[in-house]
């Protein structure tokens, strides 16, 4: 009689945590108990198969670089069982999450109407939008450095400087804040005699806003 041992087969899946679909573009490797690399590859839309791993031995699946817009997953350890069945293991990647606030100088109130743009390290536009009364939420920004730029300030506010920020390798919500100061003007009021055009003394005046609220009251002596 001749006995033939069937080779073991391991199927490794790299998936999107939010959709469950296969995630292409991640760099992965499998190492043995001694830390030697057994196989390495870049994920595609299909599961990756490895044959003839040793029964009873432990292996580790490690993500060396996540796909763009995703976070590096924790390594997975698995042991090869004595079976001809396909042994399946799945590694899931979460997405990056960034929340951007456009507020007044106090940081307490969101300001609608600002035209904002996110630029990458190559000054390429990643996303543009107009601010509202709620923070702007962005998912799947690749890990790295970015610039938040105000292209146009809301009415009554001053255009502010760029804000640089870095998207870290984490699935937690990362917050970015840009603050606008109010526009401040100066009003010069001259009260003159209609005939002589000389300044008049003893004049009182009030400065009111559009709703009639008194902003200032002065007397000319």
How should these model regions be labeled?
Residues 1-221:
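Solvent-exposed loop/turn and edge beta-strand elements of beta-rich ligand-binding domains
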């Amino acid at each position: 009689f001749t006995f033939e041992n069937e080779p073991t087969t391991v199927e490794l899946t790299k998936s999107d945590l939010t959709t469950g679909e296969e995630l292409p573009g991640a760099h992965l490797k499998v190492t043995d108990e001694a830390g030697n690399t057994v196989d390495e590859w870049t994920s595609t839309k299909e599961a990756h198969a490895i044959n003839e791993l040793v029964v009873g031995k432990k292996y580790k699946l490690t993500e060396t670089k996540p796909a763009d817009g995703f976070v590096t997953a924790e390594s997975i350890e698995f042991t090869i069982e004595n079976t001809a069945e396909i042994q399946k293991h799945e590694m899931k990647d979460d997405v990056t999450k960034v929340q951007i606030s456009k507020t007044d100088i106090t940081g307490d109130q969101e300001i609608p109407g600002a035209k904002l743009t996110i630029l990458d390290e190559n000054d390429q536009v990643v996303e543009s939008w107009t601010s509202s009364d709620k923070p702007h939420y962005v998912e799947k920004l690749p890990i790295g450095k970015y610039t938040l730029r105000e292209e146009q300030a809301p009415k009554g506010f001053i255009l502010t400087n760029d804000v640089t920020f870095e998207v870290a390798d984490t699935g937690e919500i990362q917050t970015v804040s840009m603050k606008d100061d109010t526009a401040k003007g100066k009003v010069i009021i001259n009260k003159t005699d209609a005939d002589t055009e000389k300044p008049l003394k003893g004049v009182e005046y009030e400065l009111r806003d559009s709703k009639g609220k008194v902003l200032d009251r002065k007397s000319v002596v």
